[in-house]
Amino acid sequence: MNSVKQPSNRENVFVHQSAAIDNHVIIGDGTKIWHFSHVLSHTSIGERCNIGQNVVIGPDVAIGRGCTIQNNVSVYKGVTLEDDVFCGPSMVFTNIYNPRAAIRKMDQVRPTLVKHGATIGANATIVCGTTLGRYCFIGA
């Protein structure tokens, strides 16, 4: 996999050999993606981000510059992180308010916006359709 689609001026990207990067992904300069992480298609990750181990991002996700996503986090479709956002270990984003295994509901994705400089603590759950304000701090 590891077919990173990036502008030619993005040279200092580190992607661990166990990470999977799908097609149509943009990864900014200075970003690091660690062990067993998966970035799905049509996702953009800004410059100087640190993506921990066992992280899933996408599809169709936008992550700003300088973000840190700790281990075991899933950033699902509908989530946007502005610059300098911190996502603590094992925190959770939801993207469908009323999920059901037997009923397909991807047409009901509710967007979540995390604004500049926000911090989300370990094991916190962010319900979809939420906007987290600039520099807010969410505890578990």
What would you call each of these model-derived segments?
Residues 2-6, 10-11, 17, 23-27, ...:
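Flexible, glycine/small-residue-enriched loop-and-beta-strand segment within the central core
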